[in-house]
C-alpha cells in the first residue's frame, strides 16, 4: 500500500513539475539558435548584440562625461595629459588600431579582446568608486557616473560572455587579462600626484570604453547584418 | 684704443639690429594649432593659424609623434587640407593613440614652434554634411500626399561595415517663416513630410552626427515649391464636426438628465404588475374589508341569473356508517367555466369526503381557477373571509368518516362555490349506499325526534330521487325504499331490504337530485335529474328546502309547499302510512 501511494505521489509530483515547466516556459522570448545547449539560450543573438551595443555605448558616454567633468575641475593648466601617455594598464592587449586592422581581425579574437578589456576593468572601477567617494569635495556628477559605470560594466561582461558562448561554442575563456596596479597612486597623499593618477585612470577608461564600443558595433554589423548596416 | 674698438663694434651691432627692426624682419611668431578633425574616423586633418611672420617669408612645418613612440614625423600632406593644414591619410592615422602635434614657423630670423596639441582621433570626429539631398512631391492614390526627402551618407564614412555609426537631422520651413521644423532620424536616409501648406516654397536642410562626436555642418539649402492645388487634409472641418457632435451629445445628456425617468419608461416600459380591477389597496391598508369587498362585488360578479340556469348540481345523498347526510356533488356537470373537482376517496367510507385536506384546499383555491372577474387572487386568507361569498368552511377535520364537512355556501347565491361535480370515473365502485332511501334511514337513526320532519324529508327525498327512474320499477323500488326508510326502529331489518331489493338500484348509477338553484336564504332548490335514457319527459320541478343543518352536519330538508307535485306525493303516501308505526 505504501509503495502504491508513494508512486502515485511521485507521478503526481512529476506531472506537476511538467505542467509548471510548460507554464513557465510560456514567457520565454523568441526562438533561440542554440548550439550550446539549453543553458543560456533564452535570448536570440540579435537581441543580445542589440543590448550589448546599447550598454557599451552608454558606458562610453558616461566615461566621456566623467573625464570632461574631472578635467574641467581638477586638471586645468596642470599638464596632466603629458603624464597620461602610455599609462593605461591595458596597453599590453593587442587591440587593432584602425579600421583595416579591425576588419582583418577575426571575430573570435575581437570578442576575446573585448572580454579581456571588460574583465581587466572590474577591479579598477571598484577602487575608482571607493576613492572618488573619499575625494575631498568630489562632485556628485563624477561619483554617480563612476558608480553607474561599475554596474554597467558588470552587466556588459555578462552579456558578452553569453554572446561568446553562442558565437563560439565550446571555446574556453581562459585568456589572461591585464591586471591593474595603480591603486597606490590613487591613494597617495600628494594631491597633485593623486589627481594625476585619477586623470590617467579616467583617460584610460574613456579610451577602453571606446574600443569596446567600436568593436561591438563592428561585430554587430558583421555577424548580425552581414556587413550591411 | 682697444676700448674704442669694442664700443664701436657694439654700436655697429646695435645699429644693425635697429635697422633690421625698422625693416620688420623678425623670427616668426608662434603659430597656433586650431583644430584637428576626422571626417570618418579613418583620416584626419589639422589646421593651424600662423602668427606674425616677422616680415620675412616663413615656412610652416608640422611635426608630430605618436604616443608610445619616440620618432618624430613630419606632416605627410600639406596640400589636401588647404593652406595651413596637414592631412593625415589612412596610412598615417591610428585610432586610440595620442598624437602630439607641433607646428613650426621658420623664417630667416628664427623658428617658432607652437604649443603641442594632444590629439586622439577618436574624439575629433566630425563628419561632412549628408550628400545628395533630393526633394520630391508624391501623390499616391488613396493616401495623403507628402514630401519625400532623400539623402545619402556623407563622404568618407563607412556605415555599412559598422565602423561609423551615424544619425541625421532634417529641418524645413516655409521660405518666409522664421522657425524651423526639425526631424530626427536615427539611421534611415529618407523622410516623409505631411501636412504641407500649398502654394508655399519650402527650404530644407540636413546634418548628421556620429555616435560619439560632433555635429556636421548644415547642408546647403534645398528648396521646393508646393503647388497651389496640392491637396491637404483640412483639419478645420473635422474640428467643426467634432465640436458639433460634442454639442449634440451634451444636449442629449442634458435632456436625459432632465426627463430621465420618463424617457426611460418610454423606452423600457415597466413590467405591469398584477392588478385587481376595483381593488383599492388603500382600503385594504385601512382594514375596511367590507368596503373593499363591496367594491369587488360591484364588478359584475358573481354571475347573474344566467349562471343560475347553468348551475346544475347534483347532491348525492346517501347513508353511510357514520349516519350522516352528506351532500354530494353530482357526477355530471360542467358549468360554464367551472372546472370539475377531484374528490379524494377515503378509505373508510369509500366516498370522496369533503373534509379531506387536499380537497378542502382545492376548493379553497378554486376561485382562483375560476375564470372570474377577479384579476388576481389575493391569497388564500382572503378566500376565507366569510364576507366575500367565497368560503370554504373550515370544519374540524377528523380522520374517520365522521365529521365530514358539508360543503355549502354561507350566504349568497354564489354558484361558483358549490362543489363541482366530479367525473364519474372517479367514483368508487365501492359505493354500497347510493340512494336517498338509505340515507334516510341513517337520518332516521340519527335524529329520532325529528322523525316527522324526516318523514317528510324522506318523502321529498324520495321524490327527488325518484325522478331518476320514470319507470314503475323505479317507483316500486322507491316505495320499498321509503318503506324501509320509515320504519325507524327496524333498522336492522331495514338495512338488508334495500339491499335485497335494490339489485336494480345497485346496478343503476347513483340517484341524484339536481340543485336547481340556491336562493338568498340558503334554500336549496332541487329538482329531479333528467334521465335521458328513459326518455324521461319529466319536466316537473320539485324543490326541497334546507331547513337547517344539525350539529352533526346533517342537512335537514323540508318540503317546499309551493312546488309540490301531488302525483308524486300520492303514491308513497299511500304506502308509507302502513309502514309507519
UniProtKB/Swiss-Prot annotation, chain A:
GO annotation, cellular component aspect: cytosol; endoplasmic reticulum lumen; endoplasmic reticulum membrane; extracellular space
Compartments it resides in: Secreted
Segment forming the signal sequence: 1-30
InterPro entries: 4_helix_cytokine-like_core (IPR009079), Somatotropin/Prolactin (IPR001400), Somatotropin_CS (IPR018116)
Domain of life where this protein originates: Eukaryota
Pfam (any one): Hormone_1
Modified residues (Phosphoserine): 56, 64, 120
GO biological process: biosynthetic process; blastocyst formation; cell surface receptor signaling pathway; female pregnancy; inflammatory response; lactation; long-day photoperiodism; mammary gland development
Gene3D superfamilies: 1.20.1250.10
GO molecular-function terms, A-Z: hormone activity; prolactin receptor binding
Cysteine pairings via disulfide bonds: 34-41, 88-204, 221-229
UniProtKB keywords: Disulfide bond, Hormone, Lactation, Phosphoprotein, Secreted, Signal
Function field: Prolactin acts primarily on the mammary gland by promoting lactation.
Similarity comment text for this entry: Belongs to the somatotropin/prolactin family.
Quaternary structure (record): Interacts with PRLR.
Protein name as annotated: Prolactin
The species this protein was found in: Bos taurus (Bovine)
Gene coding for it: PRL
Amino acid at each position: 500500500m505504501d509503495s502504491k501511494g508513494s508512486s502515485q505521489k511521485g507521478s503526481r509530483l512529476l506531472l506537476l513539475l511538467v505542467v509548471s515547466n510548460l507554464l513557465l516556459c510560456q514567457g520565454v522570448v523568441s526562438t533561440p539558435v542554440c548550439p550550446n545547449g539549453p543553458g543560456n539560450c533564452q535570448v536570440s543573438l540579435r537581441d543580445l548584440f542589440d543590448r550589448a551595443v546599447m550598454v557599451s555605448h552608454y558606458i562610453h558616454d558616461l566615461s566621456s562625461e566623467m573625464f570632461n567633468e574631472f578635467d574641467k575641475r581638477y586638471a586645468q593648466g596642470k599638464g596632466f595629459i603629458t603624464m597620461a601617455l602610455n599609462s593605461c594598464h591595458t596597453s599590453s592587449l593587442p587591440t587593432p588600431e584602425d579600421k583595416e586592422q579591425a576588419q582583418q581581425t577575426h571575430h573570435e579574437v575581437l570578442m576575446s579582446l573585448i572580454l579581456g578589456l571588460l574583465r581587466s576593468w572590474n577591479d579598477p572601477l571598484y577602487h575608482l568608486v571607493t576613492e572618488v567617494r573619499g575625494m575631498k569635495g568630489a562632485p556628485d556628477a563624477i561619483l554617480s557616473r563612476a558608480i553607474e559605470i561599475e554596474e554597467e560594466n558588470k552587466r556588459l561582461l555578462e552579456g558578452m560572455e553569453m554572446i561568446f558562448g553562442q558565437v563560439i561554442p565550446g571555446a574556453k575563456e581562459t585568456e589572461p587579462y591585464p591586471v591593474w596596479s595603480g591603486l597606490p597612486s590613487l591613494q597617495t597623499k600628494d594631491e597633485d600626484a593623486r589627481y594625476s593618477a585619477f586623470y590617467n585612470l579616467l583617460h584610460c577608461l574613456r579610451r577602453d570604453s571606446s574600443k569596446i564600443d567600436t568593436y561591438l558595433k563592428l561585430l554587430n554589423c558583421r555577424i548580425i547584418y552581414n556587413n550591411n548596416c | 684704443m682697444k676700448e674704442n674698438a669694442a664700443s664701436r663694434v657694439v654700436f655697429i651691432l646695435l645699429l644693425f639690429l635697429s635697422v633690421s627692426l625698422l625693416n620688420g624682419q623678425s623670427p616668426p611668431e608662434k603659430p597656433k594649432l586650431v583644430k584637428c578633425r576626422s571626417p570618418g574616423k579613418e583620416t584626419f586633418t589639422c589646421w593651424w593659424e600662423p602668427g606674425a611672420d616677422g616680415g620675412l617669408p616663413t615656412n610652416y612645418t608640422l611635426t608630430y609623434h605618436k604616443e608610445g613612440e619616440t620618432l618624430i614625423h613630419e606632416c605627410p600632406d600639406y596640400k589636401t587640407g588647404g593652406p595651413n593644414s596637414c592631412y593625415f591619410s589612412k596610412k598615417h592615422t591610428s585610432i586610440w593613440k595620442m598624437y602630439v602635434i607641433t607646428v613650426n614657423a621658420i623664417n630667416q630670423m628664427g623658428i617658432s614652434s607652437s604649443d603641442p596639441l594632444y590629439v586622439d582621433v577618436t574624439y575629433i570626429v566630425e563628419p561632412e554634411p549628408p550628400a545628395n539631398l533630393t526633394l520630391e512631391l508624391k501623390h499616391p492614390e488613396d493616401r495623403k500626399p507628402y514630401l519625400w526627402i532623400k539623402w545619402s551618407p556623407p563622404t568618407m564614412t563607412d556605415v555599412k561595415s559598422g565602423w561609423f555609426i551615424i544619425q541625421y537631422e532634417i529641418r524645413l520651413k516655409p521660405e518666409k517663416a522664421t522657425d524651423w521644423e526639425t526631424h530626427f532620424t536615427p539611421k534611415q536616409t529618407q523622410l516623409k513630410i505631411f501636412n504641407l501648406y500649398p502654394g508655399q516654397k519650402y527650404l530644407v536642410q540636413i546634418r548628421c552626427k556620429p555616435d560619439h562626436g560632433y555635429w556636421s555642418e548644415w547642408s546647403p539649402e534645398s528648396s521646393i515649391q508646393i503647388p497651389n492645388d496640392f491637396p491637404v487634409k483640412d483639419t478645420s472641418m473635422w474640428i467643426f464636426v467634432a465640436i458639433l457632435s460634442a454639442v449634440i451629445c451634451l444636449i442629449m445628456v442634458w435632456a436625459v438628465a432632465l426627463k430621465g425617468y420618463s424617457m426611460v419608461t418610454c423606452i423600457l416600459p415597466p413590467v405591469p404588475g398584477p392588478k385587481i380591477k376595483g381593488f383599492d389597496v388603500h382600503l385594504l391598508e385601512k382594514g375596511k374589508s367590507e368596503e373593499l369587498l363591496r367594491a369587488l362585488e360591484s364588478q359584475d360578479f358573481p354571475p347573474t341569473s344566467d349562471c343560475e340556469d347553468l348551475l346544475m348540481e347534483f347532491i348525492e345523498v346517501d347513508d353511510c356508517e357514520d349516519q350522516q347526510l352528506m351532500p354530494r356533488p353530482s357526477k355530471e356537470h360542467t358549468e360554464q367555466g367551472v372546472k370539475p373537482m377531484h374528490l379524494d376517496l377515503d378509505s373508510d367510507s369509500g366516498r370522496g369526503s369533503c373534509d379531506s385536506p387536499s380537497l378542502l384546499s382545492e376548493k379553497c383555491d378554486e376561485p382562483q381557477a375560476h375564470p372570474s372577474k377577479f384579476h388576481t387572487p389575493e391569497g388564500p386568507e382572503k378566500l376565507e373571509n366569510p364576507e366575500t361569498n367565497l368560503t370554504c368552511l373550515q370544519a374540524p377535520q377528523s380522520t374517520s368518516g365522521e365529521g365530514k364537512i358539508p360543503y355549502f355556501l354561507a350566504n349568497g347565491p354564489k354558484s361558483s362555490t358549490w362543489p363541482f361535480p366530479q367525473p364519474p370515473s372517479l367514483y368508487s365502485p365501492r359505493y354500497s349506499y347510493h340512494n336517498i332511501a338509505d340515507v334516510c334511514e341513517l337520518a332516521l337513526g340519527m335524529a329520532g325526534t325529528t322523525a316527522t320532519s324526516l318523514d317528510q324529508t324522506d318523502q321529498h327525498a324520495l321524490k327527488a330521487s325518484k325522478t331518476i327512474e320514470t319507470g314503475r320499477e323505479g317507483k316500486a323500488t322507491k316505495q320499498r325504499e321509503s318503506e324501509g326508510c320509515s320504519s325507524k326502529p327496524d333498522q336492522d331489518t331495514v338495512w338488508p331490504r334495500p339491499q335485497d331489493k335494490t339489485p336494480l338500484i345497485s346496478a343503476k348509477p347513483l340517484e341524484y337530485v339536481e340543485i336547481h338553484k340556491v336562493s338568498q336564504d340558503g334554500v336549496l332548490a332541487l329538482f329531479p335529474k333528467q334521465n335521458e335514457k328513459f326518455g324521461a319527459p319529466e319536466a316537473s320541478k320539485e324543490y326541497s328546502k334546507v331547513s337547517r343543518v344539525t350539529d352533526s352536519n346533517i342537512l335537514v330538508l323540508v318540503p317546499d309547499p309551493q312546488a309540490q307535485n301531488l302525483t308524486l306525493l300520492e303514491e308513497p303516501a299511500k304506502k308509507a302510512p302502513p309502514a309507519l308505526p
